[in-house]
Amino acid sequence: MHVVLAGGGTAGHIEPALALADALRRQDPTVGITALGTERGLETRLVPERGYELALIPAVPLPRKPTPELITVPGRLRGTIKAAEQILERTKADCVVGFGGYVALPGYLAAKRLGVPIVIHEANARPGLANKIGSRYAARVARLHAGQQRARRPLHRHPVRRSIATLDRAAVRPEARARFGLDPNLPTLLVSGGSQGARRLNEVVQQVAPWLQQAGIQILHAVGPKNELPQVQQMPGMPPYIPVSYLDRMDLAYAAADMMLCRAGAMTVAELSAVGLPAAYVPLPIGNGEQRLNAQPVVKAGGGLLVDDAELTPEWVQQTVLPVLADPHRLYEMSRAAGEFGRRDADELLVGMVYEAIASRR
């Protein structure tokens, strides 16, 4: 059996694909796995690091909204679809599993031409263009938000890597805090804007950090690899403020933290819910509003806070986040609510859908 994964560009598309790859290999160590990608995406680093084959195709970014540029997409896609077809034929693919983004659409269209079954994992409350098109031809579609009004806990969740799905935050916390140079006992705020960072979050946190430190809060802050690290002078007797470019071990970062300030990408919401880490979610103010919808269910369940990007200020952090970090009982209740909302076996559920799709072809 050979499965081709289509989801590249950002960690939000790549990590769930790799979580599925790991789950497939646990079930059948002989399964062949190839990930489609482009030379401009994070997959060029993340996929080989995890030991999987990466096959590159030309990048054809898709407009988020209808624009004049949309008219040119079909012509530019032809060569990319042909390249994807050649990869499916070379690998004798039994299934294409897509996670959205501009890498996924050529994979879907190539699979349709060749009669290869398609499984789509839609992480966002509002699907993007690639998954909207691909779902017309898919044998199975895993939707995180279908039936949201009827069920507090939808059937499908976002596959998360095994190191996070099996994480015991309390047991790992001493090791995690030591690794990052944090105090073993102080309340800890983790800040990250995702794999690329977020300038707005960075600016606000750098401004509010002295007030948080004076209140006894320590901070672990991933600013993003493309952003400059702030110059920090650690004051004797004050809780540490630790800025880093990128966190390669998010499992340890989650274990070290009591709360997180972050964007509301589907992967982030899923990982935090899976490990029971409460968060203050700041949805990205562009796109089609999917990040706000991603976070709303866990926030309504009591596992997080929600603030618009324009409303995120140092004063908001002081007035809203600081009281939570200073209240162990409230942190416990929010952690419990997030953990009850989350799901740790989404990768195995998706493996089942892959096998169903392949069986339906035979």
UniProtKB/Swiss-Prot annotation:
Whether Cell cycle counts among this entry's keywords is yes
Q: Please tell me which top-level EC class this enzyme sits in.
A: transferase
Keywords associated with the record: Cell cycle, Cell division, Cell membrane, Cell shape, Cell wall biogenesis/degradation, Glycosyltransferase, Membrane, Peptidoglycan synthesis, Transferase
Q: What GO terms describe the biological role, i.e. biological process, of this protein?
A: carbohydrate metabolic process; cell division; cell wall organization; lipid glycosylation; peptidoglycan biosynthetic process; regulation of cell shape
Lipid bilayer topology: Peripheral membrane protein
**Which sites bind UDP-N-acetyl-alpha-D-glucosamine?**
T10, A11, G12, N124, R161, S195, Q291
What InterPro entries does UniProt report for this protein, alphabetically? GlcNAc_MurG, Glyco_trans_28_C, GlycoTrans_28_N
Where found, per UniProt?
Cell membrane
Q: Which CDD domains match?
A: GT28_MurG (cd03785)
Which reaction(s) are listed as its catalytic activity? di-trans,octa-cis-undecaprenyl diphospho-N-acetyl-alpha-D-muramoyl-L-alanyl-D-glutamyl-meso-2,6-diaminopimeloyl-D-alanyl-D-alanine + UDP-N-acetyl-alpha-D-glucosamine = di-trans,octa-cis-undecaprenyl diphospho-[N-acetyl-alpha-D-glucosaminyl-(1->4)]-N-acetyl-alpha-D-muramoyl-L-alanyl-D-glutamyl-meso-2,6-diaminopimeloyl-D-alanyl-D-alanine + UDP + H(+)
Q: Name one GO cellular component term.
A: plasma membrane
Q: Which domain of life is it from?
A: Bacteria
Q: Name one GO molecular function term.
A: undecaprenyldiphospho-muramoylpentapeptide beta-N-acetylglucosaminyltransferase activity
What's the Enzyme Commission number for this chain?
2.4.1.227
The pathway to which it is assigned is: Cell wall biogenesis; peptidoglycan biosynthesis
Role this protein plays: Cell wall formation. Catalyzes the transfer of a GlcNAc subunit on undecaprenyl-pyrophosphoryl-MurNAc-pentapeptide (lipid intermediate I) to form undecaprenyl-pyrophosphoryl-MurNAc-(pentapeptide)GlcNAc (lipid intermediate II).
Family to which this protein belongs: Belongs to the glycosyltransferase 28 family. MurG subfamily.
> What protein am I looking at?
UDP-N-acetylglucosamine--N-acetylmuramyl-(pentapeptide) pyrophosphoryl-undecaprenol N-acetylglucosamine transferase
Instruction: Tell me the organism.
Output: Streptomyces collinus
Q: Which gene encodes it?
A: murG
